[in-house]
Amino acid sequence: TFATIWKQAEQKFDESGNESEVGINGFHAFRASWDEHPDRDEQWRDAEIGRIGEEKFRREYGCEFLVFDETLINSIKLAVMEGGSPILNMGQTRWYKKPSPEYTYCIALDPSMGTGGDYAAIQVIELPTYEQVAEWRHNTTAIPGQIRVLSDICKYVADTTSNPQGIYWSVENNGLGEAALIVINDYGEENIPGLFVSEPIRKGHVRKFRKGFNTTHSTKVTACSRLKTMIENDKMIVHSKPLISELKGYVATGSSYQAKVGMTDDLISATLLAIRMMGVLKDWDPRVYNTFTQAETDEDYEPPMPIFISGY
């Protein structure tokens, strides 16, 4: 179908997230806007939106394939999100902003086996601006190589900012994450600049403590909710086109979210891990506490009117 051809023409990223001139099907996509028609102006647009609604207008006239699936991020918000080009490429790591000594940096690794299947991904988020600074994704880098990339990113931030105390990093410790912890132990945690952040031990926790973050259904849904609120309220700045592409295919499945069949969500998983790290960091850094609490708040929320009950 035309929709499939268009979507494949829009998919311009290779396995490492680098952008090419044409889509994966060899076609080059371009758009013709509704206002290029000589008989259509703002007045016509407003009347048409009033007749069919904004979402259908953007689908019918705006060249936007707004999905009917229940995406984590509102489909209209996804349609207006635009990524940018990296200012620097260090290997497969794409940098969208130069680190600054006045900010704190949250670096999250979602590991993978590195055998060509699932991707490993790293996200670098600046605090308290909540701006995406860098990302890395690869599916043929073994776990020792993933830890070296994590270390190189931390070292670059430390060298650029001259402030290793402003770096916090962590890994997901589910499944393959256990292998990552072993590699970190062999590599030497002290050889990676910054502080290794782990989730606090919960009351009633009986398992042996492991560093990093363990992802459960509950923690994933909570992190998804926070990510949704932050992006839809413009509290989090996303620069990565591959991440935006993943968000467009990240849909509700049962009571959770995951990528559509044939799509990936590894960059999202690393972002969710960074969100969970922020939940820990807010108890340490007053700037993060104030801004993260505000970022979690839905601006459209209105408290209910009070109810008074009188016995007379």
Annotate each predicted stretch with a short phrase.
Residues 100-127:
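Gly/Thr-rich phosphate-binding beta-strand-loop-beta motif of the actin/hexokinase/Hsp70
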Residues 34-109:
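ATPase catalytic-site recognition across NTP-hydrolyzing enzymes
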Residues 275-312:
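Acidic two-metal-ion nuclease catalytic site recognized across multiple nuclease folds
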Residues 1, 126-256, 304-312:
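Mg2+-dependent endonuclease catalytic cores in nucleic-acid-processing enzymes, primarily RNase H-like
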Residues 30-32, 61, 135-136:
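Hydrophobic residues at beta-strand termini and immediately following loops
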Residues 28-32, 107, 193, 211:
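Hydrophobic/aromatic beta-strand patches that form the interior of the parallel beta-sheet core
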Residues 1-52, 180-185:
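ASCE P-loop NTPase helicase motor core
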Residues 266-278:
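Stable alpha-helical structural segments in soluble proteins, enriched in small hydrophobic residues
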